[in-house]
């Protein structure tokens, strides 16, 4: 069943890492994250860290998503930074983008679901945008991401975000070697990371399941390559997401 995630007021400060280091928002410029208001990324992807860093926020909202309508809205708003789920990028490559100029976008990123490398390369070819993929949760700020100071590996979640001590653990709490699949876990026994939630409200069973061995277990699995990049595998629970939407439970 869905869980209520309780944050304290310091969580908004954790989103500075999201905005400044991953999304690369700039003071007095416009950032645009394309997401629905029912998704946690609406808050951590376009409001908290972005406003703290001094950026204005551009928005495109409609009952039904149309790629060309969004592009035309972006041409009016002219955001310097842009973020969207993978499905939107997949929609974009199906359109004739030759008549549009995307040069005003200085930095583009993605979260919500993995992006296949073929779409990454096609977006770069058609628009000039290189997409910096990241991974976060309702429970946190961005946890893993591709950053401007490291080489992008298309399809990878990237590397740990500043402020988080992240490990891949097996079911016994032992660290996984490179190439092995494990649960993405955040160390909490040496201090509570700014940006991480405090608890699942009135849900002791969820807390007991998620906090073990001195770590918070995200419920997501991945493997790590020899260069320290993480690659998404799946969920440990029954959460189903498609096109950035939570379908079940």
Question: Where is each model-derived feature located?
Answer:
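Conserved AMP-binding A3 loop
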Residues: 1-17
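Short beta-strand-to-turn element immediately C-terminal to the catalytic PLP-Schiff-base lysine
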Residues: 6-8, 144-148, 169-170, 186-187
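Alpha-helix/helix-capping structural signal
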Residues: 10, 87-90, 113-114, 191
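Conserved AMP-binding/adenylation subdomain of ANL enzymes
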Residues: 13-30, 34-80, 95
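Gly/Ser/Thr-rich phosphate-binding loop
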Residues: 52, 79-83, 93-153, 165
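Active-site glycine-centered loops adjacent to acidic/histidine catalytic or metal-binding residues
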Residues: 112, 136, 158, 220, ...
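Residue-level recognition of short loop/turn positions
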Residues: 170-172, 181, 226-227
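Conserved ATP-binding/catalytic segment of the ANL
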Residues: 177, 185-249
């Amino acid at each position: 069943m869905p869980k209520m995630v309780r944050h304290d007021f310091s969580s908004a400060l954790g989103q500075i890492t999201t905005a400044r280091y991953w999304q690369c928002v700039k003071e007095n410029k416009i950032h645009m994250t394309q997401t629905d208001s029912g998704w946690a990324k609406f808050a951590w992807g376009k409001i908290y860290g972005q406003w703290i860093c001094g950026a204005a926020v551009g928005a495109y909202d409609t009952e039904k998503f149309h790629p060309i309508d969004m592009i035309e809205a972006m041409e009016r708003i002219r955001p310097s930074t842009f973020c969207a789920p993978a499905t939107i990028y997949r929609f974009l490559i199906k359109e004739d983008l030759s008549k549009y100029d995307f040069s005003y976008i200085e930095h583009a990123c993605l979260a919500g679901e993995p992006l296949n490398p073929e779409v990454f390369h096609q977006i770069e070819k058609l628009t000039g945008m290189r997409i910096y993929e990241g991974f976060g949760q309702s429970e946190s700020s961005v946890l893993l991401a591709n950053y401007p100071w490291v080489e992008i590996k298309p399809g990878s979640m990237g590397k740990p975000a500043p402020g988080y001590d992240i490990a891949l653990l097996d079911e016994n709490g032992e660290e996984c070697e490179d190439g092995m699949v494990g649960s993405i876990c955040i160390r909490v026994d040496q201090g509570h990371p700014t940006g991480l939630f405090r608890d699942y409200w009135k849900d002791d069973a969820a807390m007991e399941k998620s906090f073990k061995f001195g770590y918070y277990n995200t419920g997501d699995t991945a493997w790590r390559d020899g260069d320290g990049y993480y690659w998404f595998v799946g969920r440990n629970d029954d959460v189903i997401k498609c096109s950035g939407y939570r379908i079940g439970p």
